[in-house]
């Protein structure tokens, strides 16, 4: 699961005999043992109902209802007996969240931005825009810069806090440390905005691939032949062909398969090289990666946008982002709250979102009563640039085709999780 997706999908864990209780479910434990988990909540079910009953309202009413639901969620997440802080980058999610916190009544919000010495003075440096937004909304702001030497000194503690292997989370560890160093015990995060409002490129790429591969994917032999052809060509080219290229026909005809291609790191046939033939064969058989992904679409929302919200919210956000925030923040005794990840909020605005098209992030950006600065509101998605892979792997100029996330996954596994090693 880790090599295929960058994190271990629930209910699996790092330990063969241990299973996680799936999110949104419960189990009874008594003298007879442990019952099978029973689901009481489902992201897919909420979205399926929304797709069946879309809210056909005016654009003005849609905006106002979404704004009211967002402010309501933020207000509840601000309730605390200690001062509340917020992670602030220069992205639209966290900046909008700070504006909404102001509308929800926060008067002493502490905002913290994490910066990197290597990026200072470049377009990747988020600290100047974040500081501008903090001043715009009148928050008590702090900027925390880290460099390669501090990262390397802290890295053993990062690995010790990481309870299961994941290619993400290190950014959450350091921003949580920065917030905790300011004396904050509770902080808001904008996590969930991309999943809820279609901020990822996957919301366009996956449906497009499903349409393109619909007919050829009906011929199983064609997909296998394409994989073999690309595999034979790849070693002969000076520029490496992605292992995913030949798999588009095999997997691209379904939302589960196309999503796996979009989010996957390694393909199943690459695993024997990484972990041995027997372990790879046994792991793939028990995991059933397409089955795991397919469960996120039960019941099926039957609409492209709603399906993607279900997939990204269930598989990427829940299995990876939220888990990473949890272990990373708890390493610093910090409670992180995510107002955009809320079942009641999803029920309120899903019928409004499925009934419209285009950039749905516009509703979040337009929600603060004091508008974001125009150059922030109109800023495209850049992601949170973190140089940690460069700090571990080097500058990447001579590292070959796997300097990126794949190379980082290999290195992380070798450093901390290889069976004969370990932390």
Question: Model-flagged regions — what are they?
Answer:
Residues 94-97, 152, 195-199, 204, ...:
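Short catalytic/ligand-binding loop motif for oxyanion handling, primarily in non-cytosolic enzymes
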Residues 101-105, 204, 353:
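Active-site catalytic pocket residues across diverse enzymes, especially alpha/beta-hydrolases
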Residues 90, 192, 383-387:
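A glycine-rich phosphate-binding loop feature that marks nucleotide/adenosyl-phosphate handling sites
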Residues 1-163, 172, 370-380, 405, ...:
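Cysteine-centered catalytic environments shared across enzyme families
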Residues 156-160, 202-204, 391-394:
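Short low-complexity, flexible loop/linker segments enriched in glycine and/or proline
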Residues 88, 190, 317:
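Conserved S/T- and glycine-rich ATP-binding loop of Class I adenylate-forming
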Residues 174-237, 322-345:
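Active-site adenylate/phosphate-handling loop in enzymes that bind or generate adenylated species
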């Amino acid at each position: 699961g880790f090599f295929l997706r960058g994190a271990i999908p629930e209910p699996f864990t790092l330990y063969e005999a241990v299973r996680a209780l799936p999110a949104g479910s419960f189990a009874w434990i008594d003298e007879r043992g442990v019952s099978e988990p029973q689901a009481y909540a489902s992201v897919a079910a909420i979205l399926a109902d929304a797709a069946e009953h879309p809210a056909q309202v005016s654009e003005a009413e849609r905006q106002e209802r979404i704004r009211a639901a967002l402010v309501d969620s933020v207000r509840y997440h601000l309730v605390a007996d200690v001062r509340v802080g917020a992670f602030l980058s220069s992205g639209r999610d966290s900046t909008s969240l700070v504006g909404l916190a102001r509308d929800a009544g926060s008067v002493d919000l502490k905002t913290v931005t994490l910066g990197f010495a290597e990026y200072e003075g470049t377009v990747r440096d988020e600290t100047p825009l974040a500081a501008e937004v903090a001043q715009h909304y009148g928050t008590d702001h702090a900027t925390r810069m880290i460099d390669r030497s501090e990262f390397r000194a802290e890295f053993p503690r990062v690995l010790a806090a990481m309870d299961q292997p994941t290619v993400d989370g290190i950014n959450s560890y350091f921003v949580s440390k920065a917030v905790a160093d300011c004396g904050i015990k509770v902080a808001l995060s904008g996590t969930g905005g991309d999943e809820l409002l279609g901020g990822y490129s996957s919301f366009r790429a996956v449906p497009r691939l499903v349409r393109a591969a619909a007919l050829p994917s009906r011929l199983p032999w064609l997909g296998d032949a394409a994989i073999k052809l690309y595999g034979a060509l790849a070693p002969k080219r000076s520029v490496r062909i992605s292992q995913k290229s030949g798999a588009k026909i095999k997997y691209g005809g379904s939302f589960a398969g196309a999503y796996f291609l979009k989010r996957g790191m390694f393909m199943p046939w690459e695993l024997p090289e990484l972990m041995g033939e027997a372990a790879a064969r046994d792991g793939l058989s028990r995991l059933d990666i397409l089955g795991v992904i397919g469960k996120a679409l039960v019941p099926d929302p039957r609409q492209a946008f709603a399906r993607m919200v279900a997939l990204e919210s269930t598989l990427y956000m829940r299995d990876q982002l939220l888990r990473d925030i949890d272990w990373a923040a708890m390493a610093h005794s910090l409670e992180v709250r995510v107002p955009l990840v809320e079942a009641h909020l999803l029920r309120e605005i899903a019928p409004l979102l499925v009934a419209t098209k285009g950039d749905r992030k516009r509703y979040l950006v337009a929600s603060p009563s004091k508008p974001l600065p125009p150059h922030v509101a109109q800023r495209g998605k850049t992601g949170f640039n973190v140089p940690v892979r460069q700090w571990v792997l080097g500058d990447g100029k001579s590292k070959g085709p796997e300097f990126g996330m794949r190379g980082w996954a290999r290195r992380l596994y070798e450093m901390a999780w290889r069976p004969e090693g370990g932390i």
